Amino acid sequence: MEFPRVSPESVGVPSQAVLDLLDELYRYGIEMHSFMLLRHGKVFAQGHWKPYNPQTPHAMFSFTKSLTSTAIGFAVQEGLLSLDDRLVDLFPDKLPEEPSENLQKCQVRHLLMMGCGHATEIPNLGQDDPDWIATFLHHPFVYEPGTHFLYNTAGTNLLAAILARKTGQTLTQFLKPRLFEPLGVGDVHCHA
């Protein structure tokens, strides 16, 4: 999909407003590699700073969390899983011998809201742990799911693992026809 290019004024944005935005970003020391501004599905401003260009891949880090939640939304919409699916039902082979009451209550929705019930994040989970899903599920679920927020990268990775278990596809494979191709996004790799 190629977005049409138009002048800022044609979509109701003064060109000076775009220039003012760029001046403000510079004034505050915000380093931009590239930008694209759209309104009503039309690109009205776009730019790249050397050495970057539209083909330069970028590490997006936590943006993958947004992609993961988008994928879960597609999967729910397609009936492949439910927000009410419980972790104990999704990973019965990875559970502690006696799952806690809080773990038994934990659902996909709680992972999406970063409220699974952990009191602490598990540092570097998955980097050197071949059974990181079991490690996640064995970590104490101190709080009732949905009652305590904890920024939790491992929970997002678990959502990607749920997607893989339910669909047989990686996050990137699942999103390619649903999101990346329709948006014209080419070479993309999601680490989750």
Predicted regions and their residues:
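A short, well-structured edge-of-sheet supersecondary motif
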Residues: A17, L21-Y52
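Second-shell loop/turn segments in exported
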Residues: V6-E9, P96-P99, P145-G146, A161
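Extracellular/periplasmic catalytic domains that process cell-envelope and extracellular macromolecules
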Residues: G29, N102-K105, D128-D129, V142
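Aromatic- and histidine-enriched alpha-helix N-cap/loop-to-helix transition segments
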Residues: F61-L67, L103-C106, F149-N157
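Short, compositionally biased leader-like segments
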Residues: M1-P14
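Active-site SXXK
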Residues: G41, H58-D84, L111, L159-L163
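Active-site helix/loop module of the DD-peptidase/beta-lactamase fold
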Residues: A59, E78-C116, H138, T167-A192
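Catalytic-site signature segments of enzymes, centered on catalytic residues
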Residues: P54-Q55, H118-A192
